[in-house]
Curated annotation (Swiss-Prot):
This is ATP phosphoribosyltransferase regulatory subunit. InterPro entries: aa-tRNA-synth_II (IPR006195), aa-tRNA-synth_II/BPL/LPL (IPR045864), HisRS-like_core (IPR041715), HisRS/HisZ (IPR004516), HisZ (IPR004517). Belongs to the class-II aminoacyl-tRNA synthetase family. HisZ subfamily. Heteromultimer composed of HisG and HisZ subunits. It comes from Clostridium botulinum (strain Okra / Type B1). GO terms for molecular function: catalytic activity, acting on a protein; histidine-tRNA ligase activity; transferase activity. PANTHER family: ATP PHOSPHORIBOSYLTRANSFERASE REGULATORY SUBUNIT (PTHR43707:SF6), HISTIDYL-TRNA SYNTHETASE (PTHR43707). The gene is hisZ.
Length: 422
Protein backbone atom coordinates (compact mmCIF):
# COMPACT_ATOMS: atom_id res chain seq x y z
CA UNK A 1 0.00 0.00 0.00
CA UNK A 2 1.41 3.38 -1.02
CA UNK A 3 2.23 5.79 1.77
CA UNK A 4 1.39 9.46 1.35
CA UNK A 5 3.65 10.87 4.04
CA UNK A 6 5.78 12.69 1.45
CA UNK A 7 2.83 14.21 -0.45
CA UNK A 8 0.19 16.87 0.11
CA UNK A 9 -3.49 16.61 -0.90
CA UNK A 10 -4.67 17.81 -4.29
CA UNK A 11 -5.22 21.56 -4.29
CA UNK A 12 -2.90 22.25 -1.35
CA UNK A 13 0.49 23.94 -1.46
CA UNK A 14 3.59 24.46 0.67
CA UNK A 15 4.60 28.13 0.70
CA UNK A 16 8.29 28.63 1.40
CA UNK A 17 10.80 31.40 2.11
CA UNK A 18 10.57 34.22 -0.47
CA UNK A 19 7.02 33.36 -1.51
CA UNK A 20 5.93 33.14 2.12
CA UNK A 21 7.55 36.50 2.82
CA UNK A 22 5.72 38.10 -0.11
CA UNK A 23 2.38 36.62 0.98
CA UNK A 24 2.80 37.92 4.53
CA UNK A 25 3.79 41.37 3.23
CA UNK A 26 0.65 41.49 1.07
CA UNK A 27 -1.57 40.48 3.97
CA UNK A 28 0.13 42.98 6.31
CA UNK A 29 -0.36 45.78 3.78
CA UNK A 30 -4.04 44.93 3.38
CA UNK A 31 -4.45 44.92 7.15
CA UNK A 32 -2.98 48.44 7.28
CA UNK A 33 -5.41 49.68 4.64
CA UNK A 34 -8.35 48.22 6.57
CA UNK A 35 -7.10 49.46 9.95
CA UNK A 36 -6.64 53.05 8.78
CA UNK A 37 -10.06 52.93 7.13
CA UNK A 38 -11.68 52.19 10.49
CA UNK A 39 -12.15 48.41 10.19
CA UNK A 40 -11.65 46.04 13.12
CA UNK A 41 -10.19 42.59 12.47
CA UNK A 42 -11.94 39.43 13.60
CA UNK A 43 -10.73 35.82 13.56
CA UNK A 44 -13.13 32.90 13.22
CA UNK A 45 -12.50 29.14 13.64
CA UNK A 46 -11.14 27.20 10.68
CA UNK A 47 -13.71 24.47 11.44
CA UNK A 48 -17.40 25.39 11.62
CA UNK A 49 -20.64 23.44 11.84
CA UNK A 50 -22.03 22.61 8.40
CA UNK A 51 -25.30 24.31 9.40
CA UNK A 52 -23.55 27.71 9.34
CA UNK A 53 -23.31 27.37 5.56
CA UNK A 54 -26.53 25.41 4.94
CA UNK A 55 -29.08 27.98 3.77
CA UNK A 56 -31.09 28.43 0.60
CA UNK A 57 -29.01 31.46 -0.40
CA UNK A 58 -25.59 30.01 0.39
CA UNK A 59 -23.17 30.90 -2.39
CA UNK A 60 -21.04 27.77 -1.92
CA UNK A 61 -22.60 24.41 -2.96
CA UNK A 62 -22.30 21.77 -0.24
CA UNK A 63 -20.36 19.44 -2.55
CA UNK A 64 -17.60 22.08 -2.63
CA UNK A 65 -17.10 21.82 1.14
CA UNK A 66 -14.54 19.68 2.98
CA UNK A 67 -16.61 17.77 5.55
CA UNK A 68 -15.75 15.87 8.73
CA UNK A 69 -17.52 14.77 11.91
CA UNK A 70 -17.06 15.65 15.57
CA UNK A 71 -17.16 13.10 18.39
CA UNK A 72 -20.96 13.40 18.57
CA UNK A 73 -21.43 12.70 14.88
CA UNK A 74 -22.29 16.27 13.94
CA UNK A 75 -21.20 17.42 10.48
CA UNK A 76 -18.37 19.94 10.44
CA UNK A 77 -16.71 21.73 7.52
CA UNK A 78 -13.50 23.56 6.85
CA UNK A 79 -14.90 27.05 6.29
CA UNK A 80 -15.54 27.56 2.53
CA UNK A 81 -15.91 31.33 2.89
CA UNK A 82 -15.78 34.05 5.54
CA UNK A 83 -19.11 35.81 5.03
CA UNK A 84 -21.27 33.18 6.76
CA UNK A 85 -18.96 32.98 9.83
CA UNK A 86 -19.06 36.78 10.05
CA UNK A 87 -22.86 36.58 9.85
CA UNK A 88 -22.85 34.01 12.67
CA UNK A 89 -20.56 36.16 14.82
CA UNK A 90 -22.67 39.26 14.17
CA UNK A 91 -25.94 37.52 14.97
CA UNK A 92 -24.70 35.83 18.15
CA UNK A 93 -22.06 38.13 19.64
CA UNK A 94 -22.57 41.65 18.28
CA UNK A 95 -26.24 42.46 18.82
CA UNK A 96 -25.37 45.22 21.28
CA UNK A 97 -22.52 46.70 19.24
CA UNK A 98 -22.54 50.15 17.65
CA UNK A 99 -23.73 50.02 14.05
CA UNK A 100 -22.73 50.16 11.30
CA UNK A 101 -20.06 47.56 12.01
CA UNK A 102 -16.81 47.79 10.05
CA UNK A 103 -15.17 44.36 10.15
CA UNK A 104 -12.17 42.93 8.32
CA UNK A 105 -10.42 39.57 8.13
CA UNK A 106 -7.48 37.75 6.60
CA UNK A 107 -7.88 33.98 6.59
CA UNK A 108 -7.62 30.78 4.57
CA UNK A 109 -10.78 29.22 3.18
CA UNK A 110 -11.20 25.70 1.78
CA UNK A 111 -13.12 24.53 -1.28
CA UNK A 112 -13.14 21.14 -3.00
CA UNK A 113 -12.08 21.38 -6.64
CA UNK A 114 -13.20 18.17 -8.33
CA UNK A 115 -12.08 19.24 -11.82
CA UNK A 116 -8.39 19.05 -10.82
CA UNK A 117 -7.65 21.99 -13.11
CA UNK A 118 -4.92 23.51 -10.99
CA UNK A 119 -7.18 25.58 -8.76
CA UNK A 120 -6.29 25.70 -5.11
CA UNK A 121 -8.29 23.87 -2.46
CA UNK A 122 -6.92 26.22 0.19
CA UNK A 123 -7.32 29.89 -0.69
CA UNK A 124 -5.92 32.90 1.16
CA UNK A 125 -8.59 35.60 1.40
CA UNK A 126 -8.60 39.10 2.81
CA UNK A 127 -11.60 41.36 2.95
CA UNK A 128 -14.00 43.69 4.70
CA UNK A 129 -17.69 43.77 5.61
CA UNK A 130 -19.83 46.81 6.42
CA UNK A 131 -22.86 45.66 8.39
CA UNK A 132 -25.97 47.58 9.44
CA UNK A 133 -26.49 50.16 6.70
CA UNK A 134 -28.20 49.82 3.32
CA UNK A 135 -27.49 53.15 1.62
CA UNK A 136 -25.22 53.53 -1.39
CA UNK A 137 -22.70 55.33 0.84
CA UNK A 138 -21.66 51.96 2.26
CA UNK A 139 -21.51 50.40 -1.22
CA UNK A 140 -19.25 53.23 -2.37
CA UNK A 141 -17.14 52.88 0.79
CA UNK A 142 -16.69 49.17 0.12
CA UNK A 143 -15.72 49.65 -3.54
CA UNK A 144 -13.36 52.54 -2.79
CA UNK A 145 -11.69 50.52 -0.03
CA UNK A 146 -11.20 47.69 -2.54
CA UNK A 147 -9.58 50.07 -5.04
CA UNK A 148 -7.30 51.56 -2.39
CA UNK A 149 -6.34 48.08 -1.18
CA UNK A 150 -5.24 47.03 -4.68
CA UNK A 151 -3.42 50.32 -5.24
CA UNK A 152 -1.55 49.92 -1.94
CA UNK A 153 -0.11 46.64 -3.22
CA UNK A 154 1.31 48.31 -6.32
CA UNK A 155 -1.04 46.44 -8.64
CA UNK A 156 -1.25 47.94 -12.13
CA UNK A 157 -3.95 48.05 -14.80
CA UNK A 158 -6.79 46.54 -12.77
CA UNK A 159 -10.50 47.17 -13.26
CA UNK A 160 -13.45 46.86 -10.91
CA UNK A 161 -16.55 45.82 -12.87
CA UNK A 162 -19.91 46.91 -11.43
CA UNK A 163 -23.17 45.04 -11.86
CA UNK A 164 -26.49 44.87 -10.02
CA UNK A 165 -28.12 41.66 -8.79
CA UNK A 166 -31.60 43.18 -8.83
CA UNK A 167 -31.30 44.13 -12.49
CA UNK A 168 -31.37 40.57 -13.87
CA UNK A 169 -33.89 39.51 -11.22
CA UNK A 170 -36.25 42.28 -12.34
CA UNK A 171 -36.02 41.20 -15.97
CA UNK A 172 -36.75 37.54 -15.24
CA UNK A 173 -39.11 37.56 -12.25
CA UNK A 174 -42.23 37.33 -14.44
CA UNK A 175 -40.81 34.78 -16.86
CA UNK A 176 -42.33 31.31 -16.71
CA UNK A 177 -39.07 29.42 -16.89
CA UNK A 178 -37.88 26.22 -15.20
CA UNK A 179 -35.09 26.45 -12.66
CA UNK A 180 -32.65 24.44 -14.76
CA UNK A 181 -33.33 26.66 -17.77
CA UNK A 182 -32.82 29.79 -15.67
CA UNK A 183 -29.48 28.43 -14.49
CA UNK A 184 -28.47 27.73 -18.09
CA UNK A 185 -29.58 31.22 -19.11
CA UNK A 186 -27.37 32.78 -16.44
CA UNK A 187 -24.39 30.72 -17.56
CA UNK A 188 -24.81 31.78 -21.19
CA UNK A 189 -25.01 35.44 -20.17
CA UNK A 190 -21.93 35.16 -17.93
CA UNK A 191 -20.01 33.64 -20.83
CA UNK A 192 -21.19 36.51 -23.05
CA UNK A 193 -22.25 34.07 -25.75
CA UNK A 194 -24.63 36.21 -27.79
CA UNK A 195 -25.37 33.56 -30.44
CA UNK A 196 -26.20 30.88 -27.85
CA UNK A 197 -28.34 33.36 -25.91
CA UNK A 198 -30.46 34.29 -28.93
CA UNK A 199 -30.98 30.61 -29.76
CA UNK A 200 -31.87 29.77 -26.15
CA UNK A 201 -34.41 32.58 -25.83
CA UNK A 202 -36.05 31.59 -29.11
CA UNK A 203 -36.45 28.00 -27.89
CA UNK A 204 -37.83 28.45 -24.37
CA UNK A 205 -41.52 28.88 -23.81
CA UNK A 206 -41.96 31.94 -21.58
CA UNK A 207 -44.16 34.95 -21.16
CA UNK A 208 -42.19 38.16 -21.11
CA UNK A 209 -42.46 41.69 -22.36
CA UNK A 210 -40.87 42.46 -25.69
CA UNK A 211 -38.68 45.12 -24.07
CA UNK A 212 -37.32 42.76 -21.40
CA UNK A 213 -36.68 40.10 -24.02
CA UNK A 214 -34.64 42.53 -26.11
CA UNK A 215 -32.70 43.68 -23.07
CA UNK A 216 -31.92 40.12 -21.93
CA UNK A 217 -30.82 39.29 -25.47
CA UNK A 218 -28.39 42.21 -25.38
CA UNK A 219 -26.97 41.60 -21.89
CA UNK A 220 -23.70 40.04 -23.16
CA UNK A 221 -23.04 43.27 -25.05
CA UNK A 222 -23.90 45.65 -22.21
CA UNK A 223 -20.50 46.22 -20.68
CA UNK A 224 -18.06 49.11 -20.85
CA UNK A 225 -18.12 52.67 -19.53
CA UNK A 226 -20.95 54.55 -17.80
CA UNK A 227 -22.70 55.20 -21.14
CA UNK A 228 -23.89 51.58 -21.00
CA UNK A 229 -26.41 52.60 -18.32
CA UNK A 230 -28.24 55.00 -20.65
CA UNK A 231 -28.14 52.43 -23.44
CA UNK A 232 -29.80 49.86 -21.15
CA UNK A 233 -32.42 52.36 -19.96
CA UNK A 234 -33.47 52.93 -23.55
CA UNK A 235 -34.24 49.21 -23.89
CA UNK A 236 -36.67 48.77 -20.98
CA UNK A 237 -39.61 50.27 -19.10
CA UNK A 238 -39.27 47.77 -16.24
CA UNK A 239 -39.40 49.96 -13.11
CA UNK A 240 -37.36 47.62 -10.92
CA UNK A 241 -34.69 47.25 -13.60
CA UNK A 242 -34.56 51.03 -14.01
CA UNK A 243 -34.08 51.47 -10.24
CA UNK A 244 -31.17 49.03 -10.36
CA UNK A 245 -29.63 51.00 -13.22
CA UNK A 246 -30.06 54.22 -11.23
CA UNK A 247 -28.27 52.62 -8.28
CA UNK A 248 -25.27 51.69 -10.42
CA UNK A 249 -25.24 55.17 -11.95
CA UNK A 250 -25.32 56.87 -8.53
CA UNK A 251 -22.56 54.64 -7.17
CA UNK A 252 -20.42 55.37 -10.21
CA UNK A 253 -20.98 59.13 -9.86
CA UNK A 254 -19.88 59.03 -6.20
CA UNK A 255 -16.71 57.16 -7.16
CA UNK A 256 -16.18 59.67 -9.97
CA UNK A 257 -16.45 62.54 -7.47
CA UNK A 258 -13.70 60.91 -5.41
CA UNK A 259 -11.54 60.67 -8.53
CA UNK A 260 -11.27 56.89 -8.87
CA UNK A 261 -13.55 56.34 -11.87
CA UNK A 262 -10.60 55.25 -14.03
CA UNK A 263 -10.67 51.92 -12.19
CA UNK A 264 -14.40 51.32 -12.80
CA UNK A 265 -16.27 49.70 -15.68
CA UNK A 266 -19.87 48.50 -15.98
CA UNK A 267 -21.04 44.94 -16.74
CA UNK A 268 -24.81 44.47 -16.77
CA UNK A 269 -24.31 40.82 -17.75
CA UNK A 270 -22.86 40.05 -14.32
CA UNK A 271 -25.33 37.47 -12.95
CA UNK A 272 -25.12 34.90 -10.16
CA UNK A 273 -26.15 31.27 -9.86
CA UNK A 274 -27.83 31.69 -6.48
CA UNK A 275 -29.77 34.78 -5.36
CA UNK A 276 -27.12 35.58 -2.75
CA UNK A 277 -26.45 39.22 -3.53
CA UNK A 278 -29.32 41.70 -3.33
CA UNK A 279 -27.87 44.91 -4.77
CA UNK A 280 -24.63 46.10 -6.32
CA UNK A 281 -22.14 43.36 -7.19
CA UNK A 282 -18.57 43.89 -8.31
CA UNK A 283 -15.50 41.96 -9.38
CA UNK A 284 -11.88 42.96 -9.81
CA UNK A 285 -9.82 41.84 -12.79
CA UNK A 286 -6.26 42.19 -14.00
CA UNK A 287 -4.85 40.97 -17.32
CA UNK A 288 -2.28 38.68 -15.72
CA UNK A 289 -4.92 36.48 -14.00
CA UNK A 290 -7.80 34.74 -15.77
CA UNK A 291 -10.24 34.68 -12.85
CA UNK A 292 -11.40 37.60 -10.74
CA UNK A 293 -8.90 38.67 -8.08
CA UNK A 294 -11.62 40.31 -6.01
CA UNK A 295 -15.36 39.91 -5.63
CA UNK A 296 -18.00 41.54 -3.50
CA UNK A 297 -21.37 43.16 -3.27
CA UNK A 298 -24.44 43.78 -1.16
CA UNK A 299 -26.10 40.87 0.64
CA UNK A 300 -29.02 41.99 2.82
CA UNK A 301 -30.66 38.61 3.49
CA UNK A 302 -27.84 36.47 4.91
CA UNK A 303 -27.42 37.65 8.49
CA UNK A 304 -31.12 37.09 9.29
CA UNK A 305 -30.32 33.36 9.29
CA UNK A 306 -28.31 34.00 12.47
CA UNK A 307 -31.05 35.72 14.46
CA UNK A 308 -30.84 39.37 13.45
CA UNK A 309 -31.92 41.22 10.29
CA UNK A 310 -29.12 43.47 9.08
CA UNK A 311 -28.10 44.70 5.63
CA UNK A 312 -24.45 44.23 4.67
CA UNK A 313 -21.92 44.80 1.94
CA UNK A 314 -18.28 43.88 1.48
CA UNK A 315 -15.63 42.18 -0.62
CA UNK A 316 -12.97 39.47 -0.54
CA UNK A 317 -9.54 39.63 -2.19
CA UNK A 318 -7.88 36.42 -3.41
CA UNK A 319 -4.35 36.86 -2.03
CA UNK A 320 -2.99 33.90 -4.02
CA UNK A 321 -4.10 35.45 -7.32
CA UNK A 322 -2.74 38.83 -6.24
CA UNK A 323 0.67 37.18 -5.81
CA UNK A 324 0.47 35.76 -9.34
CA UNK A 325 -0.46 39.16 -10.78
CA UNK A 326 2.29 41.03 -8.91
CA UNK A 327 4.87 38.46 -9.98
CA UNK A 328 3.89 38.79 -13.65
CA UNK A 329 3.89 42.58 -13.34
CA UNK A 330 7.29 42.38 -11.65
CA UNK A 331 6.07 44.46 -8.72
CA UNK A 332 6.48 41.96 -5.89
CA UNK A 333 6.73 43.58 -2.46
CA UNK A 334 9.74 42.34 -0.50
CA UNK A 335 11.16 43.24 2.90
CA UNK A 336 13.59 46.13 2.53
CA UNK A 337 15.03 45.67 6.02
CA UNK A 338 18.77 45.11 6.11
CA UNK A 339 19.98 41.64 7.10
CA UNK A 340 23.01 41.12 9.34
CA UNK A 341 24.94 38.02 10.40
CA UNK A 342 27.15 38.31 13.49
CA UNK A 343 29.99 35.86 14.12
CA UNK A 344 32.08 35.93 17.27
CA UNK A 345 34.78 34.37 19.37
CA UNK A 346 33.30 32.49 22.31
CA UNK A 347 34.55 35.05 24.87
CA UNK A 348 32.57 37.77 23.07
CA UNK A 349 29.24 35.91 23.01
CA UNK A 350 27.53 38.28 25.46
CA UNK A 351 28.65 41.40 23.57
CA UNK A 352 27.60 39.87 20.27
CA UNK A 353 24.22 38.93 21.72
CA UNK A 354 23.63 42.40 23.23
CA UNK A 355 24.55 44.10 19.94
CA UNK A 356 22.21 41.78 18.03
CA UNK A 357 19.35 42.79 20.35
CA UNK A 358 20.16 46.49 19.80
CA UNK A 359 20.00 46.02 16.04
CA UNK A 360 16.70 44.14 16.24
CA UNK A 361 15.20 47.07 18.17
CA UNK A 362 16.11 49.25 15.17
CA UNK A 363 14.19 46.87 12.85
CA UNK A 364 17.32 45.27 11.40
CA UNK A 365 17.07 41.54 10.72
CA UNK A 366 19.91 40.00 12.66
CA UNK A 367 21.14 36.53 13.64
CA UNK A 368 24.15 35.02 15.37
CA UNK A 369 26.23 32.71 13.20
CA UNK A 370 26.03 29.02 14.03
CA UNK A 371 29.07 28.39 11.82
CA UNK A 372 32.75 28.94 12.66
CA UNK A 373 34.54 28.45 9.35
CA UNK A 374 35.05 31.71 7.41
CA UNK A 375 34.28 30.17 4.01
CA UNK A 376 31.13 28.50 5.29
CA UNK A 377 29.99 31.77 6.89
CA UNK A 378 30.50 33.67 3.63
CA UNK A 379 28.73 31.03 1.52
CA UNK A 380 25.80 30.86 3.94
CA UNK A 381 25.47 34.66 3.99
CA UNK A 382 25.41 34.96 0.20
CA UNK A 383 22.78 32.24 -0.18
CA UNK A 384 20.68 33.73 2.63
CA UNK A 385 20.76 37.25 1.16
CA UNK A 386 22.67 38.74 4.10
CA UNK A 387 23.72 42.38 3.57
CA UNK A 388 26.47 42.66 6.19
CA UNK A 389 28.68 40.25 8.13
CA UNK A 390 29.85 41.62 11.48
CA UNK A 391 32.58 39.93 13.52
CA UNK A 392 33.28 40.27 17.26
CA UNK A 393 36.95 39.31 17.27
CA UNK A 394 38.47 41.87 19.65
CA UNK A 395 37.73 44.56 22.23
CA UNK A 396 37.79 47.65 20.02
CA UNK A 397 36.55 47.91 16.45
CA UNK A 398 34.43 45.23 14.82
CA UNK A 399 34.97 43.46 11.50
CA UNK A 400 32.37 44.53 8.93
CA UNK A 401 31.95 43.09 5.43
CA UNK A 402 29.47 44.63 2.99
CA UNK A 403 28.42 41.72 0.77
CA UNK A 404 27.02 43.97 -1.97
CA UNK A 405 30.19 46.02 -2.46
CA UNK A 406 32.54 43.31 -1.11
CA UNK A 407 34.25 45.99 0.98
CA UNK A 408 35.74 45.27 4.41
CA UNK A 409 36.10 47.80 7.25
CA UNK A 410 36.78 47.90 10.99
CA UNK A 411 34.28 50.11 12.75
CA UNK A 412 32.96 51.00 16.19
CA UNK A 413 29.43 49.94 17.15
CA UNK A 414 27.94 53.41 16.70
CA UNK A 415 29.57 53.68 13.27
CA UNK A 416 28.06 50.33 12.30
CA UNK A 417 24.61 51.44 13.46
CA UNK A 418 24.88 54.59 11.36
CA UNK A 419 25.93 52.50 8.36
CA UNK A 420 22.99 50.14 8.75
CA UNK A 421 20.49 52.99 9.07
CA UNK A 422 21.46 54.49 5.70
Amino acid sequence: MEKWNKHIPEGMKDILFKESNIKLNIEDQLRKVYKYSGFSEIISPTIEFYDVFNSNIQAIPQEKMYKLFDNLGRVLVLRPDMIAPIGRITGTKMKECTYPLRLCYTANIFRVNEKLNGKRGEIAQSGIEIIGTNGIKSDVDSIVTAINALLSLGLKNFKIELGEAGFFQALTENMEIKEENLKKLKEIIRNKNYVALKKFLDEISSKYSKEDFELIKNLPKLFGDIKIIEKAKALTKNKKALRSLDDIHNIYKSIENIGLEAYISIDLGMVQNIDYYTGVIFKGYVEEVGDSILSGGRYDNLIQHFGIELPATGFAINVDDIMIALKKQNTMSMDKDKKVLIFYKEEFLRKAYDFMQELKMKKIICELSLLDDDKEILLYSKKKGIDFIIGFMGEEKLFVKDLKSDKIAFLKKDEIENLLML
